[in-house]
């Protein structure tokens, strides 16, 4: 066992001072401070997928730049906090920027609600939290009475929460910037983290509310529309010029999507956007872990022998010239496994799915019921390891998702990390087009983790759709009386409507997907069946599925086969029935006097078709 002392892992830590003061492992992104803050753009927007470290980046910028109100322009705190980082090697830059700038930092990642009033109150709370950091200015002799009254309003939460005072919230950034300029004689730097979360949440709430209140003719789902209007006012500060009162010197913003410039960012000048398609090599590695950073991280925790396993499951993202890993995945993998390795328990090391179940899955799940035949083909190509082409919308709005436009859907998946650009197939001329122009691009699923997310969401959609169409009664009845045609009709319809996820990348048996497909469907039938078992010992083996129905008077045994060759279907179905009898899967049911009928089924799947053979055993 190694005697090496390992640094604490930065698990769930997106606060830079806490990470550094806690002596946590740190991937040094400090050289990007100079790249960003010597860039001539007035406003820089970085869009990257979730879990890629955007919040930590903003926190690092804030920690490096901000003035210490107790000792203005003294950078001793920063010298300690950034000790050992690469940026301290650039003395000229540090002298000019480190601890020398008034900074306003706000995160919008927790703004949520079920109606506009709740969204507003959540947003106002975030603004109050920021404004409270500047309460010390109330004692400043450089601010006049009206300045201090404005600050008092911003630091009084009960005042801000009243929706009739929303203009004060809209003007908050401009107000704070103006006050800081009076105090320090320098224009503030504005840092906004996850700017588009309120818009994404409002759009999703509109879609939910349309369903909840579909019978109310007076109801209008307008959360997103109102949030856009409100936030346009909040972002007005970005349109100021250096000579304007309350102007800022620079703004850095992060998010997942670039909302249409003709709405939220209308009138913003000298505006640079750095998306997952950006070709500016100076900034491609700023968010996320590069391949070299990831491999060093693994080596530092003595997991370098598992680099290829980590690459297979979590790599695959390509931002211009760099292979990128999601930091959330890398940190979780190391956190869960490095002690196993130290203890020699290498068989226990697992590559789990750390992406599944987070809120962004909603967009994929919501759209699945609207897949066209063309979309189905593209989805199938994706899960089979191929690239798909579509017109990328780089300036989309969250509310357009309700229109279920295919190109917007694929664009959303690319921006949120479900897909990554296929740079080899995408044309350089297309990529160089202006952000306002839709581009013809190629994209693919980046890795096995995301492939599993596609599979899981689509299987869940099968089950949900099954419930909505009340097919569970028909299916259980059909299985309970040997109605092969009804079973075939139900399955055929489902297979035609949805893409079949085949886990080819993991080289799993073809039956695995269809087995999961049936398990998902029967989950929605839980009130109609009892003693449902999957791969449960019965007779001399393990039938794929068994259950009882009709008050435990009927028993059903299912054996599943799959093939890519239609000509083999009849033979496989016959073999499936033979397997049930040869291995005596029915024996436990034969012994139960209450069971009056036993049905054996050989189900064979071939792509989007199936075959049902049935034999009554009792």
What are these model-predicted stretches?
Residues 131, 172-184, 212-249, 585-588:
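Substrate-engagement module of ASCE P-loop NTPases
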Residues 28, 34, 69-136:
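P-loop NTPase motor core
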Residues 2-88:
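Walker A/P-loop-proximal flanking segment of P-loop NTPase domains
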Residues 189-193, 232-233, 249-256:
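Structural recognition of the conserved hydrophobic beta-strand(s) that form the central parallel beta-sheet
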Residues 271-272, 276, 325-584, 595, ...:
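Extended alpha-helical interface modules used as scaffolds for assembling large macromolecular complexes
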Residues 11-15, 105, 109-118, 122-170, ...:
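Conserved P-loop NTPase mechanochemical-coupling segment
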Residues 64-99, 213-216, 220, 224-230, ...:
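Flexible phosphate/Mg2+-sensing switch loops adjacent to catalytic phosphate-binding sites
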Residues 260-269, 274-335, 341:
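Amphipathic alpha-helical segments of the small helical/lid subdomains adjacent to P-loop NTPase cores
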């Amino acid at each position: 066992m190694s005697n090496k002392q390992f640094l604490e892992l930065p698990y769930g830590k997106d606060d830079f001072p806490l990470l550094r003061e806690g002596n946590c492992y740190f991937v040094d992104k400090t050289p990007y401070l100079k790249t960003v803050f010597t860039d001539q753009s007035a406003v820089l927007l970085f869009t990257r997928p979730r879990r890629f470290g955007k919040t930590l980046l903003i926190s690092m910028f804030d920690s490096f730049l901000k003035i210490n109100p107790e000792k203005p322009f003294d950078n001793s705190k920063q010298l300690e906090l950034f000790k050992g980082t690469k940026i301290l090697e650039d003395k000229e830059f540090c002298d000019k920027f480190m601890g020398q700038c008034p900074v306003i930092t706000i995160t919008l990642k927790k703004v949520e609600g079920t109606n506009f009033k709740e969204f507003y109150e959540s947003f106002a709370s975030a603004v109050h939290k920021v404004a409270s950091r500047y309460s010390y200015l109330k004692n400043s002799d450089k601010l006049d009475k009206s300045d201090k009254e404005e600050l008092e309003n911003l630091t009084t939460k009960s005042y801000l929460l009243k929706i009739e005072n929303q203009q004060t919230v809209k003007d908050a950034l401009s107000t704070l910037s103006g006050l800081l300029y009076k105090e320090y004689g320098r224009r503030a730097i504005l840092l906004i983290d996850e700017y588009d979360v309120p818009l994404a949440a409002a759009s999703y709430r509109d879609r939910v509310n349309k369903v909840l209140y579909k019978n109310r003719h007076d109801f209008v789902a307008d959360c997103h529309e109102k949030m856009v209007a409100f936030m346009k006012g909040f972002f007005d500060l970005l349109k100021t010029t250096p000579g304007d009162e309350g102007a800022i010197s620079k703004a850095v913003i992060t998010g997942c999507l670039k909302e249409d410039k003709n709405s939220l960012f209308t009138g913003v000048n000298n505006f640079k956007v750095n998306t997952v398609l950006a070709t500016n090599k100076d900034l491609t590695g700023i968010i996320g872990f590069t391949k070299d950073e990831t491999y060093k991280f693994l080596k530092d925790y003595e997991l370098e022998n598992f680099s290829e396993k980590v690459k297979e499951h979590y790599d695959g993202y390509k931002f211009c010239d760099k292979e990128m890993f999601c930091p959330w995945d890398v940190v979780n993998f190391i956190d869960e496994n490095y002690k196993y390795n130290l203890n020699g328990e290498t068989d226990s090391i697992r590559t789990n799915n750390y992406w599944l179940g987070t809120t962004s899955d909603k967009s994929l799940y919501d759209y699945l019921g609207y897949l066209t035949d063309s979309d189905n083909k593209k989805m199938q190509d994706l899960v089979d390891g191929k690239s798909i082409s579509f017109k990328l919308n780089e300036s989309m709005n969250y509310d357009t998702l309700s229109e279920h436009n295919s190109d917007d859907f694929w664009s959303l998946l690319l921006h949120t990390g479900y897909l990554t650009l296929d740079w080899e197939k995408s044309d350089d001329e297309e990529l160089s087009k202006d952000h306002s122009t839709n581009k013809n691009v190629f994209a693919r699923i980046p890795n096995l983790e995301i492939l599993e997310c596609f599979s899981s969401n689509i299987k869940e959609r099968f089950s949900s759709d099954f419930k909505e169409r009340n097919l569970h009664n028909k299916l259980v009845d059909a299985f309970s009386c040997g109605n092969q045609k009804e079973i075939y009709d139900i399955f055929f319809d489902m297979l035609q409507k949805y893409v079949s996820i085949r886990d080819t990348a993991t080289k799993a048996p073809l039956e695995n997907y269809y087995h999961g497909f049936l398990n998902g469907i029967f989950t929605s039938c839980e009130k109609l069946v009892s003693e449902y078992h999957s791969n449960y010992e019965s007779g001399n083996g393990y039938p794929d599925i068994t259950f009882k129905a009709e008050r435990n008077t009927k028993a059903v045994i299912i054996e599943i086969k799959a093939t890519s060759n239609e000509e083999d279907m009849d033979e496989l179905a016959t073999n499936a029935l033979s397997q049930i009898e040869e291995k005596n899967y029915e024996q436990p049911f034969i012994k139960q006097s209450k069971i009056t009928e036993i049905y054996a089924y050989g189900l064979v799947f071939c792509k989007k078709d199936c075959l049902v053979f049935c034999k009554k055993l009792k």
